[in-house]
C-alpha cells in the first residue's frame, strides 16, 4: 500500500468501507424547536430556518464501540462508520481520506506568547482542504438518497471538494 496518504485509493476495499455495520444515528433534530426528522430522507433547514443536528443512540454506541476497537481499525475517516450517516457500504464515496496529523508549532506558540500550539494538517486530505471532511459525507448521503445533481455557491476549496467527490460518485455538479 502506498505510504503517501493522497494515494490510498485501495483503502476503499478495506473493512472500514465494505463491512456492513450498524448506524447509531437515530434522527435529525432542530436544536431550536426540538422538531425531529428521519435521518435517511432529504431535508433542508428546519421550519424555524435552523440547521438539523444529528442525534445518536448513545447507549448503543457505548455498548458497541470502545477506544481499543476504534484504534484497531485502519486509520481513516471511515473507522467511525457507526457514527456517520451513511448506512450502506455501497453508498460510500471515498478518495482515501486518511487521518491527518496534529503538528506541534513551538516557535510560533512562543512568538504568540501562548502555551503549546498545535495545528491539524488537513492539507493531506485528498482535495487538499478540510472541506473534504464535510463534503465526503454530503456526497455519500446524496448518493444514498438518489440525488443526481448537486450545486454549491463557492469558488474555493468547498467547490473543489464537491467536484472531486461528486465526480467519483457519478453525480453532476453546477
Q: What is the role of each PLM region?
A:
Residues 2, 6-174:
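PLP-dependent amino-acid enzyme catalytic core
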Amino acid at each position: 500500500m502506498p505510504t503517501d496518504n493522497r494515494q490510498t485509493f485501495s483503502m476503499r476495499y478495506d473493512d472500514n468501507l465494505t463491512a456492513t455495520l450498524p448506524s447509531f444515528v437515530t434522527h435529525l433534530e432542530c436544536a431550536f424547536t426540538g422538531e425531529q426528522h428521519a435521518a435517511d430522507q432529504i431535508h433542508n433547514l428546519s421550519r424555524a430556518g435552523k440547521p438539523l443536528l444529528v442525534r445518536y443512540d448513545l447507549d448503543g454506541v457505548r455498548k458497541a464501540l470502545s477506544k481499543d476497537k476504534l484504534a484497531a481499525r485502519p486509520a481513516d475517516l471511515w473507522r467511525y462508520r457507526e457514527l456517520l450517516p451513511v448506512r450502506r457500504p455501497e453508498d460510500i464515496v471515498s478518495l482515501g481520506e486518511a487521518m491527518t496529523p496534529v503538528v506541534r508549532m513551538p516557535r510560533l506558540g512562543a512568538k504568540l506568547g501562548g502555551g503549546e500550539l498545535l495545528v491539524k494538517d488537513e492539507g493531506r486530505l485528498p482535495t487538499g482542504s478540510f472541506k473534504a471532511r464535510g463534503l465526503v459525507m454530503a456526497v455519500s448521503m446524496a448518493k444514498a438518497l438518489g440525488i443526481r445533481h448537486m450545486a454549491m455557491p463557492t469558488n474555493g476549496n468547498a467547490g473543489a471538494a464537491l467536484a472531486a467527490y461528486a465526480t467519483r460518485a457519478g453525480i453532476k455538479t453546477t
